[in-house]
Amino acid sequence: MDKILFDQIPDLFASVGNLFIEKKEELCEMDARLGDGDLGLTMSKGYGSLPDIMREEATGAAGDIGKLLMKSGMKMSSLVPSTMGFLMSTGIMEGGKALKGKTEIDAPALTAYLTGFAAGVQKRGKCEQGQRTIYDSILPAAQSADKAAKAGASLQEVITQALDAARSGVEATKNMIPVFGKAAVHAAQCEGVEDQGAVAGYYKILGLHNYICK
């Protein structure tokens, strides 16, 4: 696959949604140790609903992928009114802004989406790299994708590079001191443990990868 067409966008995100449904219990168990225990529910409900939302919004978007993502992200936010839900929907909307007017996603466009997504999460969550959050997997993914795309990599190569960087980002959180939420209160328990938010970010990239490289 060298590009993703407008009509394929719901299926692209169905790949993400299906993965989060599969990983729901795993994420909830991880989150129960150092968070609220609802991470898997939020991600599976939000991304699980996204393909149908996109199909409903497709006519109004009139072939504009950016518009479709912005409208769908807005609707998704009302379905998952939680901190992570708002971060995800904001990321999708910001990623959509970067693709405004696009009718297909090639390697540079995918990079623009990932960069916009990470920027949206950072803006909404007011987080920085190294604070043990989802940002620690999605920012390296976007940066690696950008580097690969600028070097002329294909769509599949770009998402593969992004996935590898996200995985490395997750691994790096084992040595980070948490700043937010319950994890910050129980910081000692986090040592040597992957951040569950970063894992969720990795799964987001993995879901995209599974579709693009199938």
Enumerate the language-model features and the residues they cover.
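N-terminal loops that bind phosphate or other acidic moieties
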Residues: 1-214
